[in-house]
Design a protein with these regions (language model features):
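Compositionally biased terminal segments of proteins
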Residues: 1-242
């Protein structure tokens, strides 16, 4: 479920997959399950961020308002012509080395590559512990309704982040509806999270299947980067914009 400005921007983001960029976060989840409007695009890549190549492939980013510009983080606000409302935030994060536990998927329109539902749940469970925002709880509840098991998501997060993620801590946080704007979380989502936590079973062992976030050989060709191999070992803290 994308707002009109985001939908209008989608074709301009087409080169992202060929650059090896994989969509994570709320927008990736919304594209799968359509549960809420998410207004940001958060792209991850395991390689160092090649800014010059990024801007060459998507020159509209170069004329956007820069919100953050660091070696492995580039965030801009894009004003979409003829669409009133706030700009669309596009973020690209490099050197994301936690890997993936599922197979990335291509969106129905063939434009973008997104993380698997299991990877999306695993990363959401981790970022939920770093901030108190209702949208994270909404995203997790939507994935549970869509059939992703909480236990599998906890196992995925443990595989991706190692000792930096403790399943019991996440289970407690899932039913602690205080802090930030979590108070506005709807009752249906609260009830679902409480029931799911209460009935949670053993957390399975989940393995990291690849250090490459994208899917070489998928429907969209992924071009190689020239910035060297990814740094071994996982990043224990995902970028918060997820």
């Amino acid at each position: 479920m994308l707002p009109p400005a985001q939908r209008a921007l989608l074709p301009l983001l087409g080169p992202a997959a060929a650059l090896g960029l994989t969509l994570y976060g709320g927008t990736a989840i919304a594209l799968h399950v359509g549960h809420r409007q998410s207004v940001d695009f958060d792209f991850f890549i395991e390689r160092a961020l090649d800014r010059s190549r990024l801007l060459k492939a998507m020159p509209f980013l170069g004329s956007a308002l820069v919100l953050q510009d660091e070696p492995d983080t580039f965030t801009v606000a894009v004003v979409v012509d003829d669409y009133p409302g706030p700009p669309v935030k596009v973020s690209v994060f490099g050197s994301i080395t936690f890997g993936r536990v599922g197979e990335p998927e291509v969106t129905d329109d063939g434009l973008l590559v997104t993380a698997s539902l299991l990877d999306l749940l695993g990363t959401k469970l981790k970022v939920m512990l770093q901030r108190a925002e209702a949208k994270d709880y909404q995203d997790i509840a939507a994935l549970l309704r869509h059939g992703v098991r909480l236990e599998d998501g906890l196992g995925a997060a443990r595989a991706l982040y190692g000792k930096a993620f403790q399943p019991q801590e996440a289970l407690r946080a899932l039913t602690y509806f205080e802090g930030g704007d979590v108070a506005r979380l709807g009752q249906a989502d609260r009830d679902l999270l409480a029931r799911t936590v209460a009935s949670a079973g053993m957390v399975p062992e989940v393995v990291v299947r690849s250090g490459t976030l994208g899917a070489p050989g998928a429907a969209l060709p992924l071009a190689p980067f020239d910035s060297g191999p990814p740094t071994p070992g996982g990043d224990p803290h995902p970028p918060e914009p997820i």
